[in-house]
Amino acid sequence: MKSLLPTTGLALLLALSLTPAQGEEVTLEHQGLTLNANLETTGANWPQGPVVLMTHGTLAHGGMETLQGLQSALKDRGISSLSMTLSLGLDNRHGMYECATPHSHQHTDAVAEIGAWLGWLQGQGTAKVALLGYSRGGNQSARFAVEHPEVPVNAVILIAPQTWNEADAEQDYRQRYGKELAPHSQL
């Protein structure tokens, strides 16, 4: 039993050292909703930049494992990051969006929230910002950059960006299933 104690202690210390970085939760009010994000800084002078503003994929959240890992890797390289959780129409949303919850948000709602977080970063004194979007967040980050060229963004990083075109989706469905994509009126 004695020989297991040092091994168990070493394994526990190793596991704790591999845990993704846990930054500070920050919030802001936007269009009647509280938005939240995870701020991972590299020290007291973090606003001097660069800072990466991260947007997650469909129905996910800013604390998802992929983004936590990216925040940790960025911090290891001396880069601060802010991983936002899109509200998806819910106040102070945390965690995955429940599929059973009625969806009233629009794909384009994220553009305004990205702008709100960029405004927050500018208010902190940040001048060097890169947008990073993962999956659907990649599409939304690219959309923000195109629709708001007046906002200073130093880089746009897209990881597996979601792309979608209604006509292409309908054609793909027709080819796959041999029928038109249309609402089903009978359940």
Please identify what each model-predicted range represents.
Residues 133-137, 141:
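Gly/Ala-rich beta-loop-alpha elbow adjacent to hydrolase catalytic centers
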Residues 35, 102-105, 152-187:
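The alpha/beta-hydrolase serine catalytic core
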Residues 131-133, 159:
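Short beta-strand immediately N-terminal to the catalytic nucleophile in serine-hydrolase-like folds
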Residues 21-44:
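N-terminal cap/lid segment of alpha/beta-hydrolase-fold proteins
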Residues 8-17:
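Bacterial N-terminal signal peptides
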Residues 101-123:
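Alpha/beta-hydrolase active-site loop
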Residues 46-47, 52-77, 81-86:
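Short, surface-exposed "cap/lid" segments of acyl-processing enzymes
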Residues 87-105:
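Cap/lid segment of the alpha/beta-hydrolase catalytic domain
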